[in-house]
Amino acid sequence: MGQKVNPIAFRTGVTRGWGSRWYASKQDFADLLVEDRKIREFITKHPKKSQYKSAGIDRIEIERTRDEVRVMLYVARPGLIIGKKGQEIEILQAELQNLVGRRINLKVEEVGRPELQAQLVAEDISQQLAKRSSFRRTMKRMLEQTMDAGAKGIKIQMAGRLGGAEMARREKQSAGSIPLSTLQAKIDYGFTEAMTPQGHIGIQVWINQGTYGDDNDGADAQTGQASKKPKRSYKR
């Protein structure tokens, strides 16, 4: 039987960079790993800042040095996190420092094309379902919107009590090509859950952003770029 593998984990360290970049001894590794998880969950599930969910957080990258922890947020609407004159980001930075007990260097960067980021597309679908939108109409709209933005392919899958049905089921729609086994392909993956009166609905999104060789010659996994393979020459 074929096994489904997370496309991000499948490419990490090969054609995609790591979300956490630091080194630690065996004694400290587990504690720092838990600390990274605390940082990510605190930002994405902030107990007081509900606007963070509307900011469109695509991913959180963490780097560590001897003196500080560098946290990079990639968001669709950075103004909701930065706030007026940077007040909100300073508050968040102080909260993170109190959480982990270390010096935090927090940076926020805007995502250039949010329509091509799988996590942002999944969260957009979740918000539409929470507003009681038709799941089929929502899937079709997101397929068209993502393909119009320049994606090579997209697949959306939902599971749960779709449309308020008594029995849970799974439905999916796709457009274009999604070569999951091709390491050279830029496959982005996102998952979230929609809270509806009937229960939770799981949402999975795969987006084919092209190939690593389309944009540049590539470098290594540290920069998230894949190296080009030399073209074969055939002689007759």
Curated annotation (Swiss-Prot):
Keywords: Ribonucleoprotein, Ribosomal protein, RNA-binding, rRNA-binding
Segments forming domain KH type-2: 39-112
GO biological process: translation
GO MF annotation list: mRNA binding; rRNA binding; structural constituent of ribosome
The keyword Cell membrane appears for this protein: no
Gene3D superfamilies tied to this protein: 3.30.300.20, Ribosomal protein S3, C-terminal domain (3.30.1140.32)
UniProt xrefs under InterPro entries: KH_dom, KH_dom-like_a/b, KH_dom_type_2, KH_sf_prok-type, Ribosomal_S3_C_sf, Ribosomal_uS3_bac-typ, Ribosomal_uS3_C, Ribosomal_uS3_CS
Spans annotated as Disordered: 212-236
Cited CDD domains: KH-II_30S_S3 (cd02412)
Family note: Belongs to the universal ribosomal protein uS3 family.
Function noted in UniProt: Binds the lower part of the 30S subunit head. Binds mRNA in the 70S ribosome, positioning it for translation.
Assembly and oligomerization: Part of the 30S ribosomal subunit. Forms a tight complex with proteins S10 and S14.
Protein name: Small ribosomal subunit protein uS3
